[in-house]
């Protein structure tokens, strides 16, 4: 049996079902597994994606039946991903793109958020819980739509999504504002993503709110990557990338592969760390940041400073100054719940913390870092297209630029391509040297004409869909939204 405990309190021990149903520990810590399971990597590399997903996830979700996980993975990673689940595309030499945007909402979040609703429903069955689950989601763009798509019309669940007003692309906003379903709600929040995320976290940590909702038979949960159920499915595609390189004869078994990950909340790259700890021959995990380069500074100096200028960039899903999942890594490296609790207390009270030199050294054994300016992002999009014929979005461009700086001779580099370029058509079109129309749908059509590529049907169809949600609130209003729900 695999148990989980809080990064801030060892004594708070839960099962996988409890961790997924609850989302966040009561004192604000994140749930982490008690150990890293060791797996037969060679055997896993022989499996197709659904079977691989079931095998990896079952190592952690030990209170779920293996038959359930196998069926859940089979139904999740089939037609909805168009046969391209975990697709690895060659780009240049031994640099590859792991294209994670072939799912229903055209972003990597689909890998977790198409499976996670099934995990939540099963968790409630495992725990004999019958209450309504209220899911609160803070999003910088992609998580919101992926969560709405995964959870819409799931029985016994309500979901409310909060995004920073003006802090997403227009396509991302419309994906959320037009979402269908009787159990969904979307709110724009004045401020940036960190304001929205902090507001949601405060609701989770407010015992009075929890008590009032409990009186109505409602329990809070999260679909953000603070929830273990969001993180564990993302481990799978690191194994899938390695398996494809192995099958193509690009590596021999046991050879290291480096991964460069465009990073905001630190969940996607942390999944790579878990894969490495499970035995996958991951070399370097390169953390690629945009102009909001708080993680680059931390990984370089050991000091995390969230109180800094915030930039709205062309890669909005990474416009984040408080990277929640870093807390999990700090726990795994230090092994001390008291130390992590102290660091998070310092971050909350002063906006910064500094880790011990030996902690930073331990992190640097697995992680490297770099960042890209807006000019470098645009240049990378154009260079990849003109040189390699590869069309990428702004977030992948951040990572391609950093990957080129960190590439090791003879070691394959896999860049995680996290979103379709058609989610950010104006930025991509302008990077290619074209004048972009103000309207995103006209820009999408112009990008199709300029590149000969076809926009995903789900994005093009947004133009015909009616907007359902337009409410704008202050961060403090998130609590009022939560308290407005009835069983």
Residue ranges of model-derived segments:
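PLP-dependent amino-acid enzyme catalytic core
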Residues: 1-487
């Amino acid at each position: 049996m695999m148990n989980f405990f809080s990064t801030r309190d060892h004594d708070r021990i839960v099962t996988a079902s409890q961790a997924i149903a609850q989302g966040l520990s009561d004192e604000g810590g994140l749930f982490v597994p008690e150990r890293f399971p060791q797996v037969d990597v060679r055997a896993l590399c022989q499996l197709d994606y659904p079977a691989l997903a079931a095998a990896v996830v079952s190592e952690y979700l030990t209170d779920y039946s293996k038959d359930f996980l196998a069926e859940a993975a089979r139904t999740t990673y089939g037609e909805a991903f168009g046969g391209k689940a975990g697709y690895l595309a060659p780009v240049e030499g031994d640099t590859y793109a792991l294209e994670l945007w072939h799912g229903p909402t055209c972003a990597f979040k689909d890998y977790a958020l198409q499976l996670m609703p099934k995990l939540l429903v099963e968790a409630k069955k495992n725990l004999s819980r019958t209450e309504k689950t209220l899911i609160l989601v803070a999003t910088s763009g992609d998580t919101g739509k992926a969560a709405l798509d995964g959870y819409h019309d799931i029985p016994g669940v309500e979901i409310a999504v909060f995004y920073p007003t003006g802090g997403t692309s227009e396509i991302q906003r419309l994906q959320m504002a037009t979402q269908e379903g009787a159990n969904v709600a979307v709110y724009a929040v004045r401020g940036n993503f960190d304001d929205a995320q902090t507001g949601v976290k405060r609701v989770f940590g407010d015992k009075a709110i929890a008590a009032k909702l409990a009186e109505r038979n409602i329990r809070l949960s999260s679909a953000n990557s603070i929830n273990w159920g969001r993180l564990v499915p993302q481990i799978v595609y690191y194994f899938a990338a390695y398996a494809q390189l192995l099958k193509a004869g690009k590596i021999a078994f046991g050879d290291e592969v480096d991964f460069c990950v465009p990073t905001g909340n630190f969940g996607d790259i942390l999944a790579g760390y878990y894969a490495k700890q499970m035995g996958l021959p991951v070399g370097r995990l390169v953390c690629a940041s945009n102009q909001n380069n708080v993680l680059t500074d931390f990984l370089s100096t050991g000091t995390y400073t969230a109180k800094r200028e915030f930039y709205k960039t062309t890669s909005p899903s990474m416009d984040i100054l408080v990277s929640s999942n870093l807390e999990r890594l700090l726990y795994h490296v230090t092994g001390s719940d008291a130390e992590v609790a102290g660091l998070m207390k310092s971050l909350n009270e002063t906006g910064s913390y500094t880790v011990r030199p030996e902690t930073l050294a331990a992190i640097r054994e697995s992680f490297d870092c770099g960042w890209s300016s807006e000019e470098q992002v645009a240049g990378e999009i154009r260079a990849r297209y003109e040189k390699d014929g590869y069309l990428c979005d702004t977030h992948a461009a951040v990572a391609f630029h950093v990957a080129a700086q960190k590439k090791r001779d003879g070691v394959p580099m896999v860049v995680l391509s996290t979103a379709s370029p058609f989610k950010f058509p104006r930025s991509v079109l302008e990077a290619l040297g074209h004048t972009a129309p103000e309207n995103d749908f006209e820009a999408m059509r112009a990008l199709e004409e300029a590149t000969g590529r076809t926009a995903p049907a789900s994005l093009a169809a947004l133009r015909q869909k009616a907007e359902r949600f337009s409410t704008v609130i202050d961060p403090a209003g998130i609590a009022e939204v939560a308290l407005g729900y009835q069983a």
